[in-house]
Amino acid sequence: MEMFTAIFLGDTFVVKDSFNFLPQSLEKLVSTLVRKKNANHRVLFKNLYKFFKTQNPPDEKAFDILLCKQYYPYEYMDSWEKFQSGLPPREKFFNKLKDIHLTEEEYSHVENVFKTFNMKTMRDLHNFYVQCDVALLADTFENFREMSMRIYGLDPW
């Protein structure tokens, strides 16, 4: 029997552990959707597109950037003052959990994000990172739910 982690908040709101349904990283789930043949990415990723078009309508290049893995300097962001600073150097993106640094190519992607979306501060990058992550997660769940209902006639949520 499979076990699912769920938190019940009253009678109408339930938070379920999505990893039980989709046991892959968000990066892998998104790349699977991106590779769908004949797929319109603005339809597959409608939450992502809807959110970012209200701020600054993304052209194709900018929208492709949204579909890539994003990077965040978790350990570096240890004070409110750092939200007011500009983009930190590459070594500040060190990941203690995985014991790895960003590659030059990965940092170049961060610089490209900063430039493409007219960011000035780490607050801008932080908000972009969180909003992009949540929108991609929502789109991934919605695609999984639609597929489950279409193929199996079951709503996983």
Residue ranges of predicted features:
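Metal-dependent nucleotidyl/phosphoryl-transfer cores and adjacent nucleic-acid-binding surfaces
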Residues: M1-W157
